[in-house]
Curated annotation (Swiss-Prot):
<dbReference type="InterPro" id="IPR019927">
    <property type="entry name" value="Ribosomal_uL3_bac/org-type"/>
</dbReference>
<dbReference type="GO" id="GO:0003735">
    <property type="term" value="F:structural constituent of ribosome"/>
</dbReference>
<dbReference type="InterPro" id="IPR009000">
    <property type="entry name" value="Transl_B-barrel_sf"/>
</dbReference>
<protein>
    <recommendedName>
        <fullName>Large ribosomal subunit protein uL3</fullName>
    </recommendedName>
</protein>
<dbReference type="GO" id="GO:0019843">
    <property type="term" value="F:rRNA binding"/>
</dbReference>
<dbReference type="Pfam" id="PF00297">
    <property type="entry name" value="Ribosomal_L3"/>
</dbReference>
<keyword id="KW-0694">RNA-binding</keyword>
<comment type="function">
    <text>One of the primary rRNA binding proteins, it binds directly near the 3'-end of the 23S rRNA, where it nucleates assembly of the 50S subunit.</text>
</comment>
<dbReference type="GO" id="GO:0006412">
    <property type="term" value="P:translation"/>
</dbReference>
<comment type="similarity">
    <text>Belongs to the universal ribosomal protein uL3 family.</text>
</comment>
<keyword id="KW-0699">rRNA-binding</keyword>
<keyword id="KW-0687">Ribonucleoprotein</keyword>
<comment type="subunit">
    <text>Part of the 50S ribosomal subunit. Forms a cluster with proteins L14 and L19.</text>
</comment>
<keyword id="KW-0689">Ribosomal protein</keyword>
<dbReference type="GO" id="GO:0022625">
    <property type="term" value="C:cytosolic large ribosomal subunit"/>
</dbReference>
<dbReference type="InterPro" id="IPR019926">
    <property type="entry name" value="Ribosomal_uL3_CS"/>
</dbReference>
<dbReference type="InterPro" id="IPR000597">
    <property type="entry name" value="Ribosomal_uL3"/>
</dbReference>
Length: 209
């Protein structure tokens, strides 16, 4: 069954194995997640749990948010996500989820919002090749041809300059290297999307190797 938890990306470090090999890991502080709601087929048409992470200031929460959180005997949350494919019998409204739901060696998917890069050209945004940088060349870092004249328009999906980053990104099949239950930290192998202190969702890997 699927399981997941929300956390905050703290940054990267390295962990040394028994044979002295260094493994780059990302440290995720999962804190205390609270089950805000259980959804079932009869009421909602599908099965899922809704979890909340990180308390929101009371003056920033509206009345529906306060009422929704009160049913779980908790404060309104900044980040709320749904996780499908879970066994509803294992969860209760108001239950706290911590780092110990994962174990070392498990494979997980980590989803987050990628770093925003602003308005970027085709070379940085789409990994296009540049033209010759010689004096005689009249093409260096432009987007290149946008298609034939005949359609009288530019087709959708053309690789052009524009806003880069700030997208929902999921990195699949990352190994859990270490779980620190005292400090509620999960260390996963490799990098995960987003800047430091951003919210990420750690869930059971969908495509297990």
């Amino acid at each position: 069954m699927t399981k997941g938890i929300l956390g905050k990306k703290l940054g990267m470090t390295q962990v040394f194995g028994p044979n002295g090999t260094a493994t780059a890991v990302t440290v995720i502080e999962v804190g205390s997640n609270v089950v805000l709601q259980k959804k079932d087929v009869e009421t909602d048409g599908y099965e899922a749990i809704q979890i909340g992470f990180e308390d929101k200031k009371e003056q920033r929460a509206n009345k529906p948010e306060k009422g929704h959180a009160a049913k779980a005997n908790t404060a309104p949350k900044r980040f709320i996500r749904e996780i499908r494919g879970v066994n509803l019998a294992d969860y209760e409204v108001g239950q706290e989820l911590k780092a110990d739901i994962f174990a070392e060696g498990e494979m997980v998917d980590v989803a987050g919002v990628s770093k925003g890069k602003g308005f970027q050209g085709a070379i940085k945004r789409h990994n296009q090749s540049r033209g010759p940088m010689a004096h005689g060349s009249r093409y260096h870092r432009g987007p290149g041809s946008m298609g034939a004249v005949a359609p009288n328009r530019v087709f959708k999906g053309q690789t052009l300059p524009g806003q880069m980053g700030g997208d929902n990104v999921t990195i699949q099949n990352l190994e859990v290297i270490k779980v620190d239950t005292e400090r509620n930290l999960v260390l996963v192998k490799g990098s995960v999307p987003g800047p430091k202190n951003s919210c990420v969702l750690v869930s059971t890997a969908v495509k297990k190797n």
